[in-house]
Amino acid sequence: MGSFSLTHWIIVLIIVVLIFGTKKLRNVGKDLGGAVHDFKQGLNEGTDGKEAQKDDVIEHKKDEDKA
């Protein structure tokens, strides 16, 4: 009794579509997808900066060794 069956989820989905409409749900999906994309892009930019700093440190050490 604690878990929902497939028919329960279908009924819930139909009720949600009737209440909000497909256009509003589509907009929510686009907004959520954009937020996830921006979040992942921000994470990638953060790691790129760290890798660039490591490369700079390595190059700086090589320059010191040559001098």
Curated annotation (Swiss-Prot):
Primary location: membrane
Subunit structure: The Tat system comprises two distinct complexes: a TatABC complex, containing multiple copies of TatA, TatB and TatC subunits, and a separate TatA complex, containing only TatA subunits. Substrates initially bind to the TatABC complex, which probably triggers association of the separate TatA complex to form the active translocon.
UniProt topology in membrane: Single-pass membrane protein
MF terms (GO), sorted A to Z: protein transmembrane transporter activity
PANTHER family, sorted: SEC-INDEPENDENT PROTEIN TRANSLOCASE PROTEIN TATA
Signal sequence segment: none
Subcellular location: Cell inner membrane
Sequence similarity: Belongs to the TatA/E family.
Organism: Neisseria meningitidis serogroup B (strain ATCC BAA-335 / MC58)
Region annotation (Disordered) ranges: 43-67
Stated name of the protein: Sec-independent protein translocase protein TatA
Keyword terms of this UniProt record: Cell inner membrane, Cell membrane, Membrane, Protein transport, Translocation, Transmembrane, Transmembrane helix, Transport
Biological process according to GO: protein transport by the Tat complex
UniProt function note: Part of the twin-arginine translocation (Tat) system that transports large folded proteins containing a characteristic twin-arginine motif in their signal peptide across membranes. TatA could form the protein-conducting channel of the Tat system.
Positions with biased composition (Basic and acidic residues): 47-67
